[in-house]
Structure formats: structure tokens, C-alpha cells
């Protein structure tokens, strides 16, 4: 009983921590999970990251366990993950890994794939591993479905699905800044994040992303000038992704190199693009 599945990374439009409402978009970087189930009644689960064997596999092991518990089977399992989403890139590698792990385990069992169940078990696993504050339903759905999702994270509801109408690139900056998840400070900017979210609901995703980035970078003591540097180099919009320290900048193809050059003085960069084709079982 084997199965492989992939799920996307995602970038932030609105971080949901301040208000409970968030938005994210799928990017063309993926994590693949390969699951093999063993019907031996021992319930031993072993995981490994092929790209980074020193990375603890506790999240994907938890995902497999939760799926097996849900379907009330006592199989053992082996799970390996690989992909091109950099760890700590701000591109929701944990959402991608958990979605892919759950999907591959359900596939290996031969059970019918139900999107709500996949997302619920993936988010449950992230909560149990203390990897999320809000459940990251926006990140999880953008990773799973692709495109743009606008969500009520508290109620786990998708309020709106959309996609970018233009052919654009995503330049990701991964600086060596110390991560800061000060929830109290993020709650202080709630009213202003609400204003950015209104832009998002109206379909003005570029402005929403930029405003969100300014607000959260200020609250978390990350430099806001980086986003302006990206604009100066020709980006359409730019802002902090998630709780940082990474930033995302969206630009037209002809400005890709200028934007990358403006950002890479702050750290490593990755260039990708939005993706509307979400998670799927490969075989």
C-alpha cells in the first residue's frame, strides 16, 4: 500500500493572526510525500526528509498517525518528503508538507479523498505540533487548492477564491533576521489589518499585500523599507510573508531581475510564480 502526493507552497496576502481573517496564494513550489503502509498491527511510524535528513519529521509522522487513527487502522508506516520549498522561506512549507502527508496516507489506504477531511487532519496535526497560531486555514487552502483563497480562519471557511489575472513572478527574500512571533503586538494592529482585509475582499490584492506587509513588519520589528526597495526596482507589490522574516515581491517578467537584485543584498532569494493547480495524488 503506497501512494505519493504533492501540495504547494503559498505566500501571504493577509496574515490572519491579528483578526482571524487571512488570505494567501499558491506558488509553483511543492512538497512531495511518499507513504508506504505496512499491515503489521504495530502502529510504528517513521519519517524522513530526503532533502534535509536532520530535519525532525514529527509533523508528517503526526499527519500519518492522525489519518490512520481516523480510519481506525493499526498499520505501521514509512513516510518520506522532498521538494523545492526552502525551509523557513515564509512559503508555508509546513502547510504543504502536512497536506501532502495526509493526502498520500489517505491515498495509500485507498479511501475516497475528501478535501475538508484532508485540511482538517492537516491543520489538526499542525496544532498538535504547535506550528500554528490560527490554524493557518488560509495557507492550508492556498496550498491545497492553488490560486488565491480568502478565509475566515476561526471558522475554517473560504470566503472567496480567485487568481491573479496577470502573468507575474514571485521573488522571495529569505533574510537572516531573527524570527519574532509576538502575538500581543500583532493583535494591536487589528483595526488597521481590517482595512487591508477590506482591500483583499474587494479584489485589490496588490494593495492588501503591501499594507499587510507594512503593518506586520512594523509590529514585529522587521524593516519596512525592503518592500519599498522592491517597488523602486519595479515590483507591483511586496510585503512580509507570514510572520517573517521572509518577504515576497510580485512583479512582471521584465522586472524580475531588477527586483531580485534589489532584494538579494538582504539575503537569499528564490524566484517562482503563482500556481492555480493545487494538491494532487501522483500515483
Swiss-Prot record:
GO terms for molecular function: ATP binding; shikimate kinase activity. Coiled coil: none annotated. It comes from the Archaea. GO terms for cellular component: cytoplasm. The keyword Zinc does not apply. Keywords: Amino-acid biosynthesis, Aromatic amino acid biosynthesis, ATP-binding, Cytoplasm, Kinase, Nucleotide-binding, Transferase. Pfam families: GHMP_kinases_C, GHMP_kinases_N. It catalyses: shikimate + ATP = 3-phosphoshikimate + ADP + H(+). One of its GO terms (biological process) is amino acid biosynthetic process. Pathway: Metabolic intermediate biosynthesis; chorismate biosynthesis; chorismate from D-erythrose 4-phosphate and phosphoenolpyruvate: step 5/7. Belongs to the GHMP kinase family. Archaeal shikimate kinase subfamily. This is Shikimate kinase. It comes from Methanococcus maripaludis (strain C7 / ATCC BAA-1331). The lineage of its organism: Archaea, Methanobacteriati, Methanobacteriota, Methanomada group, Methanococci.
Amino acid at each position: 500500500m503506497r501512494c505519493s502526493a504533492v501540495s504547494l507552497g503559498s505566500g501571504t496576502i493577509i496574515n490572519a493572526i491579528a483578526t482571524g481573517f487571512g488570505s494567501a496564494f499558491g506558488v509553483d513550489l511543492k512538497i512531495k510525500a511518499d507513504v508506504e503502509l505496512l499491515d503489521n498491527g504495530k502502529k510504528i511510524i517513521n519519517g524522513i526528509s530526503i532533502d534535509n535528513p536532520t530535519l525532525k519529521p514529527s509533523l508528517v509522522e503526526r499527519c500519518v498517525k492522525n489519518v490512520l487513527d481516523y480510519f481506525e487502522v493499526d498499520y505501521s508506516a514509512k513516510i518520506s518528503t522532498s521538494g523545492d520549498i526552502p525551509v523557513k522561506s515564509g512559503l508555508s512549507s509546513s502547510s504543504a508538507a502536512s497536506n501532502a502527508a495526509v493526502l498520500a496516507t489517505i491515498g495509500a489506504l485507498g479511501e475516497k479523498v475528501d478535501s475538508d477531511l484532508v485540511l482538517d487532519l492537516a491543520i489538526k496535526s499542525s496544532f498538535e505540533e504547535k506550528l500554528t497560531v490560527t490554524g493557518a486555514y488560509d495557507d492550508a487552502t492556498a496550498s491545497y487548492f492553488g490560486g488565491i483563497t480568502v478565509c475566515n480562519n476561526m471558522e475554517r471557511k473560504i470566503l472567496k477564491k480567485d487568481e491573479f489575472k496577470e502573468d507575474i513572478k514571485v521573488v522571495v527574500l529569505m533574510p537572516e533576521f531573527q524570527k519574532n512571533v509576538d502575538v500581543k503586538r500583532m493583535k494591536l494592529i487589528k483595526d488597521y489589518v481590517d482595512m487591508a482585509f477590506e482591500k483583499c475582499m474587494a479584489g485589490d490584492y496588490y494593495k492588501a499585500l503591501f499594507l499587510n506587509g507594512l503593518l506586520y513588519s512594523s509590529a514585529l520589528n522587521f524593516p519596512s523599507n525592503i518592500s519599498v526597495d522592491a517597488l523602486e526596482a519595479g515590483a507591483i507589490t511586496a510585503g512580509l510573508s507570514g510572520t517573517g522574516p521572509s518577504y515576497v515581491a510580485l512583479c512582471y517578467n521584465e522586472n524580475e531581475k531588477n527586483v531580485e537584485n534589489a532584494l538579494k543584498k538582504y539575503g537569499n532569494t528564490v524566484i517562482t510564480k503563482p500556481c492555480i493547480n493545487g494538491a494532487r495524488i501522483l500515483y
